Amino acid sequence: MTITPATHAISINPATGEQLSVLPWAGADDIENALQLAAAGFRDWRETNIDYRAEKLRDIGKALRARSEEMAQMITREMGKPINQARAEVAKSANLCDWYAEHGPAMLKAEPTLVENQQAVIEYRPLGTILAIMPWNFPLWQVMRGAVPIILAGNGYLLKHAPNVMGCAQLIAQVFKDAGIPQGVYGWLNADNDGVSQMIKDSRIAAVTVTGSVRAGAAIGAQAGAALKKCVLELGGSDPFIVLNDADLELAVKAAVAGRYQNTGQVCAAAKRFIIEEGIASAFTERFVAAAAALKMGDPRDEENTLGPMARFDLRDELHHQVEKTLAQGARLLLGGEKMAGAGNYYLPTVLANVTPEMTAFREEMFGPVAAITIAKDAEHALELANNSEFGLSATIFTTDETRARQMAARLECGGVFINGYCASDARVAFGGVKKSGFGRELSHFGLHEFCNIQTVWKDRI
């Protein structure tokens, strides 16, 4: 049999080019079997009590910690994340289980209220099996931050993972099995686009959650909408990182480098468009370029390296094409702009200056280790530039004037604002975007309630 991306998911080590695994796409029988298991699993799971489900979350966290190094090594091998960052992803995911186990049950408690002397109760009921289409850039965290609250709420979770991280998908499934989660409550299968469409249409899928590109999210969202099924979309971002003249320069540069080059720049909610007030622009740019140049790129298994390869060669080629287009449009190259010689999908840390709003690096998401610097005349101009985007995931403001920062935050068109810090996600607070960055929220009680039937029960209303 000829193996091609049309017939199989192919996982390739991005650091070496070595083929890691090959898995055929799920056929109609595989999909039907998965849906049958999911339907049966949900029927039983929804009847379990919340304390039992919370305890199972703790078991998932324990099972994940027991396989922590195995999981981290798999993440690094399949998508090139530097090993220390992969270990941090595993630890964060295990902690998420504990947090929802401790706090989630209270968030799902019935809420009684009086309405004109009549008793009413808001109940949080499960919806059914949720189809989750997840990306490769945080192959564990993205799955866990959806699966954990979804399962706690009494739903089932059916994963379609990115084809280049099938080893991660298999290992995550093993973690849930180790924790005693029934197969039909947590499941996964290697579905292609046609398989995804088939599942969305099926009545045994209650809702869909997607993390991915705008193009993929729009296509899947349209299918979910046609089936009148709820959909949560966490899509791309081109986050502005605003530095005003009164900012703490050293702190801003440190955060800028971390915010742009974490995970080799392959993060949806990450600093991408650096909007710098002109009075501090020269000093910021000089220090930022020096700090980016000092980053160590190489084998992601080496703990000394902070930059690894990009996850796929086609993504590296697309990024390089975006850089070349931006330079042809008049931007100035201050650092990098080249593929690293030798094996692997490495792209050197890159800094572009004199970037203006009509250029590619400003208009499009740069999903890799490329920073685009734009000069703002003043704070008002910085806000205008920041909002001049089809994306609205998150934003950063660096200034020592907290009052002004909060005033600016209120006018930024995005789902999250970071004042004197860089983008992060945490179980305790909501995460999501606006505009073409998607809709719906993950994490906190908002993420827990997204996939609940919020049911009002009236008593003795005549």
Annotate each PLM feature.
Residues K109-L251, A376:
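Rossmann-like NAD(P) dinucleotide-binding subdomain of oxidoreductase/dehydrogenase enzymes
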Residues G17, R53, I75, C97, ...:
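Residue-level signal for inorganic ion chemistry
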Residues M1-Q118:
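N-terminal Rossmann-like NAD(P)+-binding subdomain of aldehyde/semialdehyde dehydrogenases
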